[in-house]
Amino acid sequence: MSFEGFPGLPPHVNARISTFMSGDLPPAHRNMGIRPDLWCKEASVGRVLFRWPNDGSRDINDGRVFGGWIAALSDNIVSLCMVTALEP
């Protein structure tokens, strides 16, 4: 999958996240099924919007998502948000 970049981000930020957003994910993301390449819908400096399609595959009970997985997803979102604000 190719990544064209987010129009609200400076070129150096789009360059930093291009591999990640093209689906070339690190092992931890692949193992946990965290897909920023599919779920990150918008990004601008200091802001990202993720839409996670909760299909129940991360549930520990009916309608209850495993908290550790939510923590990992949240960490990923916050990290990506931080990257949008880094200087060149």
Regions found by a protein language model. Name each.
Residues 1-88:
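Terminal targeting signals and extreme-terminal segments of soluble enzymes
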